[in-house]
């Protein structure tokens, strides 16, 4: 029900019931160049059950042999823009048909300048075993020039409760030299990236806004945090997503370069969010909303799940100029996944989409009652 991404891999062998195909085809109104099969299978799913036979029934030669980290950005590559527009149109029509479409503008009101916080912003860095990159990330965070006070949370996670490669000691050393660093090491062995965010967000030292910085990435320049906070006050939103530049570890630009996620529009972004595989970076949050909803305690898709839940009721703001460098290197967690791990990740996000789809249908029914 929630497998709405247009790159869902059904495999090369698909059997269709003729009468169901004919019925679905009669409801097709658009002549797509790229979204034809996607539109068809969405319409099939509106009236029929799609069944996966979990047995080996055939073999084929894989033609796309790129690593998962290379395929990850296909949907935001500018050369694929027109096909993505078609996919969005097909998905939006499907959401309207099943009662999950959310009309633009129906948001809960926000006043992000209300209330008192110890600092205006907190930079969030979950970390585990990033001795090669954590100093770059922390230096980037500490070098921000702002008109307000901010701090930097570094939250360790993983089965050992802390890093085992020297990261913990390096962060401790940097924290002794700069009191803005809030280094959290717990005795929890179940803590994932999402749980690390929750721990920092509920800490009384957390600021009005919480801004993402992954432990192997860096901000584009010293003005990133100021731009984020200014945008929150200008747009009065619960979540803010920026644009980023794809680079290697040495900050050399990699194709497709700037990822601006222009598929997000104020009118239809939260509907299209159910189709795409990610919302963008860096992600920042108004802390009271983050504390209200929280992230799932996982190491994958936790930010996507939170973004979907926020977008159901609150406005998500955007910055389309690159303010963040997403570094691709040999130790990216999603750089070269096995087929089994990639499938596991996709199933998790599809489950998030299913739950969100059901929540939106329920919301619309309640509003119509």
Give, region by region, the residue ranges found by the protein language model.
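Conserved donor NDP-sugar-binding/catalytic core segment of glycosyltransferases
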Residues: 1, 223-256
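A recurrent flexible, glycine/aromatic-enriched loop bordering the glycosyltransferase active site
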Residues: 2-15, 262-284
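Acidic donor-binding loop at a coil-to-helix junction in glycosyltransferase catalytic cores
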Residues: 31-40, 299-306
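Catalytic beta-strand/loop signature of glycosyltransferases that borders the donor
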Residues: 51-57, 63, 243, 317-323, ...
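Short, acidic, metal-binding catalytic loop of nucleotide-sugar glycosyltransferases
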Residues: 139-149
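A conserved acidic beta->alpha catalytic loop
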Residues: 156-170
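Glycine-rich, basic loop-to-helix element that forms the pyrophosphate-binding segment
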Residues: 187-205
